[in-house]
Amino acid sequence: DLGMEGEPESVKAYYEGAATMGEIAKKAAAMEGADFVALILEGGDPNGVNKSVDELIAVVKEVADAIDAPLVVEGCKNVEKDAELLPKVAEALQGRNVLILSEKEENYKAIGAAAGLAYDQIVGAESAVDINLAKQLNVVTTQLGVNAQKIVMNIGSAAAGYGYEYVVSTMDRIKGAALSQNDNMLQMPIITPVSSETWGVKEATASEADMPEWGPEEERGIDMEVMTAAADLAAGSDAVILRHPEAVAAISRMIKALA
C-alpha cells in the first residue's frame, strides 16, 4: 500500500506510469508468470506510517476492483493492528474468496472467526518455523469452526543462507506427517512470503561501491529471491510471494519445466 517507495529501480521501471494502487495492481496481475497478486498493508504499522483502518480498506477495495486475479492481502505484522484490520478486510472483500495473511496464535480468534467464518475467506495461519506450532494453530482455528479446506499455512520464512535450514527441515517434517502419517491438521497448502526476507539481506542491499566483487546490486537481489523461492518450492511450499518481475518469470518457467 506504500507504492513504489524503496523498490529497486527495475521494479519501479516495470510499474512506470502506474500512478494509483489500482493501476499498480493491474500491472502486477499482468506480470509474466504471475498467478496471483499480493497486497501488503505495510502502511498500517503503528510504528511506521500508521495509516488508519479506513485508509487501508479504501486501498484494499481499489486493488480488488482493479483486478480479476486471485488476491492475497497481508497485514502490517503488528498483532494488535492486524486483529483490528484483517477482519475489516475480510468483510470488505466478502464474496471474493481472498487469502487473508495472517492470523497468529495471539490473534487467531479475531482473524480466524471473521475471515474463515463470518465472511468465508481463506485464512492464512502463520507460525514461527515449528511443526508443533503450525499444527496447533491449525487445530485451534478449526475448533473455531473454520473448514480445514479454508486454511493455508505460512510456516515462516528466511532468505537462503540465513538459518534457512530450519525452514526446510520444518517443511520436510510437515509434509512427511501430512503424507506418511495422514495427519489432516498438517495437510493444508503452504504459502511462503519470500521477497520480504530476501530483499533485506546484505547480499541484496550492499552497494557495488562497498562490495564490487559481488557484482551488480540489483542482480544479487533477484538471484537471492529466485534461489530462495526455488528452495521453498522444492522443500514443500505450494506458493511463493515474490517482488521482482524477473524473479517471478524465472520461477514460473522453472515450475512449468518441472510440471
How would you label these PLM feature ranges?
Residues D1-K27, G48-K51, G75-V79, L101-E103, ...:
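Active-site mouth loops of central-metabolism enzymes
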Residues A38-I40, V49, P70-K81, G95-Y108, ...:
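Catalytic beta/alpha-barrel core
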Residues M21, L56, V60, D82, ...:
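Aromatic/hydrophobic pocket-lining residues that form the small-molecule binding cavity
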Residues A28-E32, A58-A66, P87-Q94, I111-Y119, ...:
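Acidic (Asp/Glu)-rich catalytic clusters
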Residues E106-A247, I251-M254:
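Catalytic alpha/beta core domains of metabolic enzymes, predominantly
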Residues E5-E9, G33-E62, I67, V73-E80, ...:
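Glycine-rich, proline-tolerant flexible connector loops at the mouths of alpha/beta enzymes
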Residues D1-L2, V37-G44, I155-G156, P193-S196:
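Short loop/turn segments at strand-loop or loop-helix junctions that form parts
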Residues A66-V72, R96-K104, S180-T192:
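Short, acidic/small-residue loops that bind anionic groups at enzyme active sites
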